[in-house]
Regions:
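Active-site-adjacent structural elements in enzyme catalytic cores
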Residues: 1-272
Length: 272
């Protein structure tokens, strides 16, 4: 595995315009200098991702956020409540925002991750890091350094920060309009958001990670209230079936992508 020996090495690579896999509490990201158009294009090329789709910029907690996006009262309240953490805010773009990052949209997605390695990297780098999930386009998001290696081999240097504690992508809230709107659910639920900003509105804003072919495992996932009955029925139909053991919701989220990757490797048809 092409591991970065330390954070300083990862910083040097980012300063050179290279792409580095970085850990966050949600999933591993494919990181590049958010102020370097060439680095952003390298991210798109490495992922095989369609151009013109926005990517999230990750910032240090101490960073000058308002250079990247325009914060209204709702945005500031949500940032105070949930940053650092698994929340991405969609805001009117600021002066530092490149078209390559925003997909030429008038908005930008910003997040302040809570992962200590990610925060240390961002502080030492001293700028924003654009980082969609560190997988090939349409594949399952990685939650460990090994998952990233499965996707890219030695092609991408990896800053190993251990397994992602949350394991699913960040909640995305659009705060670029009068009423905030939930664009992508995540570990921070709608009720928690509304406790801060009141009832949510509706938005047609394009969110990072919202293309229809995102996060598409080969194994189908079945949510079931009668898992044993469904297993018997599906096996009678000739399907290869596996079951994810009962566990608290937070553990389900943390283990889901790893389980789907394993099922893809084993050739399982359906995971219950």
């Amino acid at each position: 595995m092409n591991r970065c020996p330390d954070i300083a090495h990862a910083v040097r690579l980012l300063q050179m315009g290279e792409v580095v896999a970085v850990p966050t509490e949600t999933v591993y990201g494919l990181g590049g200098d958010a102020k370097n158009p060439l680095a952003i294009r390298r991210i798109y090329a490495t992922k095989g991702r369609p151009a013109g789709h926005p990517v999230i910029v990750h910032l240090a907690f101490e960073a000058p956020w308002t250079e990247w996006g325009q914060f209204n009262d709702h945005a500031l309240a949500l940032a105070k409540a949930f940053w650092p953490g698994p929340l991405t805010l969609i805001l009117p773009r600021g002066t530092q925002a490149l078209d390559e990052v925003t997909g030429t949209l008038p908005t930008i997605g910003l997040r302040v991750p809570s992962h200590p390695t990610a925060q240390a990297l961002l502080r030492q780098f001293g700028s924003g890091i654009a980082a969609p999930s560190a997988n090939r386009f349409g594949r399952i998001s990685p939650t460990t350094a090994d998952h990233v290696f499965m996707e890219f081999g030695e092609q991408i240097p990896i800053l190993d920060g251990g397994p992602s504690k949350i394991g699913i992508e960040s909640t995305i809230v659009d705060v670029s309009q009068e009423r905030p709107a939930l664009l992508r659910p995540g570990s921070i639920g709608q009720s928690a958001i509304e406790a801060v900003v009141g009832p949510m509105g509706h938005s047609d804003t394009v969110a990072p990670g919202s293309l229809k072919s995102h996060y598409a495992p080969m194994t189908s996932l079945l949510l079931s209230h009668a898992p044993e009955e469904d297993r018997i029925r599906l096996e009678k139909e000739g399907k290869t079936v596996a079951m994810l053991r009962a566990q608290p919701p937070q553990e389900y989220a943390q283990n889901l992508y790893a389980a789907l990757r394993k099922m893809d490797t084993l050739g399982v048809d359906i995971l219950i």
